[in-house]
From Swiss-Prot:
GO CC annotation, single: cytoplasm
Keywords: Cytoplasm, Endonuclease, Hydrolase, Metal-binding, Nuclease, Ribosome biogenesis, rRNA processing, Zinc
UniProt GO MF annotations: metalloendopeptidase activity; RNA endonuclease activity; zinc ion binding
Protein's cellular compartments: Cytoplasm
Organism classification: Bacteria, Pseudomonadati, Pseudomonadota, Alphaproteobacteria, Rhodobacterales
Primary gene name: ybeY
Role description: Single strand-specific metallo-endoribonuclease involved in late-stage 70S ribosome quality control and in maturation of the 3' terminus of the 16S rRNA.
Cofactor binding note: Binds 1 zinc ion.
Protein name: Endoribonuclease YbeY
Length: 170
C-alpha cells in the first residue's frame, strides 16, 4: 500500500497519524483480502474549518464532520445490502483508491463524548473512510448493516472494541 499523509493542522502528530492510517488502511485491505496490490490512499489531517469547507464544496453541507472520503472508483453496490464491486488497477497501472480527510476537532470531541481513546477513534474513522473508498456506505439500511459489521470485525483485529456499543461513562 502506498500511503500519503498530509498534515494541515499542527495539532495532528504527523508520525502518529501516519502510523494510525497505516494500521487502519492495511487492516481494512487485509480483512477484505485486497492487500495484494499497491493501493494508493491519501489522508488529510485537518481541522473543523477545513473539513466544513470541503463538506460544503462536495456535499453541500456547510458544517464540520468527522471524516470525508473521495473514492477514485465508483464501486458502490446497486442494490441495498449488495456487495460493492472490487477495485481494479486501471490500464495505466494506477491503483488509486482515493482520498480521506479527517478533522482533529470533531475527532477529539467525539472521542471525549464517547469516553473512548482518541487513537482508537482515529483508527475507527480511518477504517470507516477506507470502506467508503471501497464502495461501502451507510445510507441504506442493508448497506449500513454490512458496513458496520465490517468495521466491528476490522477494529476487532486491531484490538479495538465495538464502537457501536454505548457505554454510560469511563
Amino acid at each position: 500500500m502506498i500511503l500519503d499523509v498530509v498534515i494541515e493542522d499542527a495539532r495532528w502528530d504527523a508520525a502518529a497519524l501516519e502510523k494510525q492510517a497505516q494500521e487502519a488502511v492495511s487492516a481494512t485491505l487485509a480483512y477484505l483480502e485486497l492487500e495484494d496490490e499497491d493501493w494508493e490512499v491519501t489522508v488529510l489531517g485537518c481541522d473543523d474549518a477545513r473539513i466544513a469547507d470541503l463538506n460544503a464544496e462536495f456535499r453541500e453541507k456547510p458544517k464540520p464532520t468527522n471524516v470525508l472520503s473521495w473514492p477514485a472508483q465508483e464501486l458502490a453496490a446497486a442494490q441495498d445490502g449488495g456487495q460493492p464491486t472490487p477495485p481494479e488497477v486501471d490500464f495505466m497501472g494506477d491503483a488509486a483508491l482515493g482520498d480521506i480527510a479527517i478533522s482533529y476537532d470533531t475527532c477529539v470531541k467525539e472521542a471525549n463524548l464517547a469516553h473512548k481513546s482518541r487513537e482508537d477513534h482515529v483508527r475507527h474513522l480511518l477504517v470507516h473512510g477506507t470502506l467508503h473508498l471501497l464502495g461501502y456506505d451507510h445510507i441504506r439500511d442493508g448497506d449500513a448493516t454490512i458496513m458496520e459489521t465490517l468495521e466491528v470485525g476490522i477494529l476487532g483485529k486491531l484490538g479495538i472494541p465495538d464502537p457501536y456499543i454505548i457505554e454510560d461513562g469511563p
